[in-house]
From Swiss-Prot:
Residues 54-67, 401-440, 450-459, 579-593 have a biased composition (Pro residues). The modification N-acetylmethionine is found at M1. The keyword Repeat applies. SUPFAM superfamilies: Ankyrin repeat, SH3-domain. The modification Phosphoserine is found at residues 84, 100, 102, 110, 113, 119-120, 134, 183, 187, 203, 280, 316, 332, 339, 526, 567, 597. PROSITE patterns: ANK_REP_REGION, ANK_REPEAT, SH3. Regulator that plays a central role in regulation of apoptosis and transcription via its interaction with NF-kappa-B and p53/TP53 proteins. Blocks transcription of HIV-1 virus by inhibiting the action of both NF-kappa-B and SP1. Also inhibits p53/TP53 function, possibly by preventing the association between p53/TP53 and ASPP1 or ASPP2, and therefore suppressing the subsequent activation of apoptosis. Is involved in NF-kappa-B dependent negative regulation of inflammatory response. Residues 758-820 form the SH3 domain. Keywords: Acetylation, ANK repeat, Apoptosis, Cardiomyopathy, Cytoplasm, Disease variant, Ectodermal dysplasia, Methylation, Nucleus, Phosphoprotein, Repeat, Repressor, SH3 domain, Transcription, Transcription regulation. This is RelA-associated inhibitor. The modification Omega-N-methylarginine is found at R137, R142, R144, R160, R167, R180, R205.
Length: 828
């Protein structure tokens, strides 16, 4: 058992070691691929600089196997006459690059780089003179301005391998990742130059005419025909680069390459990671990649070990198919746009991140009713009847404004608003036609909802008077045709009813009547749409008549039936509200003898209220507010004139309310100094506590108002008065978080320390006190007591004092530095 456990532990350690080794190799491979990407970026910059040359570079010939270092290769005549640096190096011509060719120029590529760093494991690929054309030129890392087309990849020696056809010749080294499923670089022997770098494939855009010959040559080298003449992929790659990029387009491509390097830190690059190794770092270092849309469509077309597709596979067909797809813009924006896989100069048209113009106007109106309906449903229980602009006739929110639009369809109703609701029963015939007047709005949901509202019109038949009284309001509503109806009350939203309450006709009727009540008289309660509010029609008519008479609308001949029954109440209200009507002369001499009243009894029954007897005298009464209420409110708001008038009507300016708050408390909290001074001078009690024991000095201290504290102390405020809740003095109530705390706290602390020391220790009694023990002194309000000893070791709240030749203990919270001010006016 121990051996098995040891063996399992050893296997586990071996697995951990292998996993760590693999992670280390992956990190090294990531660094290697990053260096390769940097070299490729420099290569593309050099290619873009040389793309302005008058002639394309000619591909040199050479077998795939490693040839002698300076062996001449068979070059076709069209390319051999262009004076490529390789031919100049072979023939010893006088070209500027040909004189620098010697064997020592290849030494920097052998084990150490010019910077002293060891070269990568793929160094043998750099030793191929046919795969790297710049070995024959000078060691200057910067290309010459002339003869740019001669050597397209001439560059300074680099210790790190660059992507491209540099690895395409020679046998694979032991470090080639032939078995890595996620590596974008496949086997150099199993695949042609296209398998190594799918981004080097032909562009979906048509090539320029100047490069037709190199394109055909490159195509023949890909297909395997003419491999001896065009086997070196370097020239074919240069031709393809010149075909792919227009002149001076290297800035945008460099930006895209730089942007491609950033996502290399994330594990999932695109959707193609499903088919590749998840954590392969080389997946994310390709300078150009097809987007996820193209990758998913054609991954199985090639039997490549690379996770990306060649650029010449399915690019144009997918782009053409994608143009017809309306949703491709969003997908291309979501995948190809942010990753920047294609240079903007040769992007397909379908990848341009431009939103389509046709789906936009169709989608916007389709989404508008959704938020509006939800808002109406949350705010109003009857949103279904009034959410549309057509304003269906059964809506209780619109105060009879919609009928003029829908009533002209039936011919027997030429005037729908003059005598409004006797004509409402024919509305069910017009209900099926309600969707047709408003076809411009999506009203597909309203016809089934409108099957419920035809019930309320049957309830409205016996009450034409209500609509007669509201005719001017309705006509004014017809002029103002707002798209959305607002609740009549500006102070609240109408309460939302439960779904089952909308089908009850009584509740809909109550909601309609309440919506028609004038705004100043509308109730603010939350239960006004409850079933208990549904009163008989007579009461509602009576209420409407009362309102019309109160607003002096006497031209109400419309109400016909029950008017004699309701007129006594309305006339009594009118007599109290304003001047009497010209018709009734009888109520003017009320003090007349009783024998004159019987002949006028019939008229007085119509003129006088039923709540008052016929012979009762009328007195002119006016409302009189409580002076205490006026005093408290005016002291808080700072109205000195009102305070003075209220004090004249009161016997005690310190009269408190039910909470013990006096006008002096409110004036101090409102920082009204003039009112504070007036109340103190008028004899207000500066020590009047409220229900919590707060005196005016506590209020002033809590506001950090030193000026008011000084005024209160000088007029006999109790310095050591304590609150009932926490027993705190005024000094302890100073607010340290408000302005003026330091001054107020310092002043109150000095006053406390001065009590019994200033004025030869004289303090003044503010209340009467009767001694309970033999060692205590009794005193009355206003008497001066001399403090002999304070802060004794045994008593802290009691001082040893002398009064009238007697000594004893006195409570310190009964005294102040100054005597209390007496009232200076006679009581009313």
């Amino acid at each position: 058992m121990d051996s098995e456990a040891f063996q399992s532990a050893r296997d586990f350690l071996d697995m951990n070691f292998q996993s760590l080794a693999m992670k280390h190799m992956d990190l090294k491979q990531m660094e290697l691929d990053t260096a390769a990407a940097k070299v490729d970026e420099l290569t593309k910059q050099l290619e873009s600089l040389w793309s302005d040359s008058p002639a394309p570079p000619g591909p040199q010939a050479g077998p795939p196997s490693r040839p002698p270092r300076y062996s001449s290769s068979s070059i076709p005549e069209p390319f051999g006459s262009r004076g490529s640096p390789r031919k100049a190096a072979t023939d010893g011509a006088d070209t500027p690059f040909g004189r620098s060719e010697s064997a020592p120029t290849l030494h920097p590529y052998s084990p150490l780089s010019p910077k002293g760093r060891p070269s990568s494991p793929r160094t043998p690929l750099y030793l191929q003179p046919d795969a790297y054309g710049s070995l024959d030129r000078a060691t200057s890392p910067r290309p010459r301005a002339f003869d740019g087309a001669g050597s397209s990849l001439g560059r300074a020696p680099s210790p790190r391998p660059g992507p491209g056809p540099l690895r395409q010749q020679g046998p694979p080294t032991p470090f080639d990742f032939l078995g890595r499923a996620g590596s974008p670089r496949g086997s150099p022997l199993a695949e042609g130059p296209q398998a190594f770098f799918p981004e080097r494939g032909p562009s979906p855009r048509p090539p320029a005419t100047a490069y037709d010959a190199p394109a055909s040559a490159f195509g023949s080298s890909l297909l395997g025909s003419g491999g001896s003449a065009f086997a070196p992929p370097l020239r074919a790659q240069d031709d393809l680069t010149l075909r792919r990029r227009p002149p001076k387009a290297w800035n945008e491509s460099d930006l895209d390459v730089a942007y491609e390097k950033k996502p290399s830190q994330t594990a999932s690059y695109e959707r193609l990671d499903v088919f590749a190794r998840p954590a392969s770092p080389s997946l994310q270092l390709l300078p150009w990649r097809e987007s996820s849309l193209d990758g998913l469509g054609g991954t199985g077309k090639d039997n490549l070990t690379s996770a990306t597709l060649p650029r010449n596979y399915k690019v144009s067909p997918l782009a053409s198919d994608r143009r017809s797809d309306a949703g491709s813009y969003r997908r291309s924006l979501g995948s190809a746009g942010p990753s920047g896989t294609l240079p903007r100069s040769w992007q397909p048209v379908s990848r341009i991140p431009m939103p389509p113009s046709s789906p936009q106007p169709r989608g916007a109106p389709r989404q508008r009713p959704i938020p509006l309906s939800m808002i109406f449903k949350l705010q109003n229980a009857f949103w279904e009847h009034g959410a549309s602009r057509a304003m269906l006739p059964g809506s209780p929110l619109f105060t009879r404004a919609p009928p003029p639009k829908l009533q002209p369809q039936p011919q027997p109703q030429p005037q729908p608003q003059s005598q409004p609701q006797p004509q409402l029963p024919p509305q069910p015939q017009t209900q099926p036609q309600t969707p047709t007047p408003a076809p411009q709005h999506p009203q597909q949901t309203w016809p089934p909802v409108n099957e419920g509202p035809p019930k309320p019109p049957t309830e409205l038949e016996p009450e034409p008077e209500i609509e007669g009284l509201l005719t001017p309001v309705l006509e004014a509503g017809d002029v103002d045709e707002g798209p959305v109806a607002r609740p009549l009350s500006p102070t609240r939203l109408q309460p939302a009813l439960p779904p089952e309450a909308q089908s009850v006709p009584e509740l809909e009727e109550v909601a309609r009547v309440l919506a028609e009540i004038p705004r100043p008289l509308k109730r603010r309660g939350s239960m006004e749409q409850a079933p208990a509010v549904a009163l008989p029609p007579t009461h509602k008519k009576q209420y409407q008549q009362i309102i019309s008479r109160l607003f002096h609308r006497h031209g109400g001949p419309g109400p016909g039936g029950p008017e004699p029954e309701l007129s006594p109440i309305t006339e009594g209200s009118e007599a109290r509200a304003g001047p009497p009507a010209p018709a009734p002369p009888a109520p003017i001499p009320p003090p007349a003898p009783s024998q004159s009243s019987p002949p006028e009894q019939p008229q007085s029954m119509e003129m006088r209220s039923v709540l008052r007897k016929a012979g009762s005298p009328r007195k002119a009464r006016r409302a009189r507010l409580n002076p205490l209420v006026l005093l408290l409110d005016a002291a808080l708001t700072g109205e000195l004139e009102v305070v003075q008038q209220a004090v004249k009507e009161m016997n005690d300016p310190s009269q408190p309310n039910e909470e013990g708050i006096t006008a002096l408390h409110n004036a101090i909290c409102g920082a009204n100094y003039s009112i504070v001074d007036f109340l103190i001078t008028a004899g207000a009690n500066v020590n009047s506590p409220d229900s919590h024991g707060w005196t005016p000095l506590h209020c002033a201290a809590s506001c950090n108002d030193t000026v008011i504290c000084m005024a209160l102390v000088q007029h006999g405020a109790a310095i050591f008065a304590t609150t009932l809740s926490d027993g705190a003095t005024a000094f302890e109530k100073c607010d340290p978080y408000r302005e003026g705390y330091a001054d107020c706290a310092t002043y109150l602390a000095d006053v406390e320390q001065s009590m019994g020391l200033m004025n030869s220790g004289a303090v003044y009694a503010l209340w009467d006190y009767s001694a309970e023990f033999g060692d205590e002194l009794s005193f009355r309000e206003g008497e001066s007591v001399t403090v002999l000893r304070r802060d004794g070791p045994e008593e802290t709240d009691w001082w040893w004092a002398a009064l009238h030749g007697q000594e004893g203990y006195v409570p310190r919270n009964y005294f102040g530095l100054f005597p209390r001010v007496k009232p200076q006016r006679s009581k009313v």
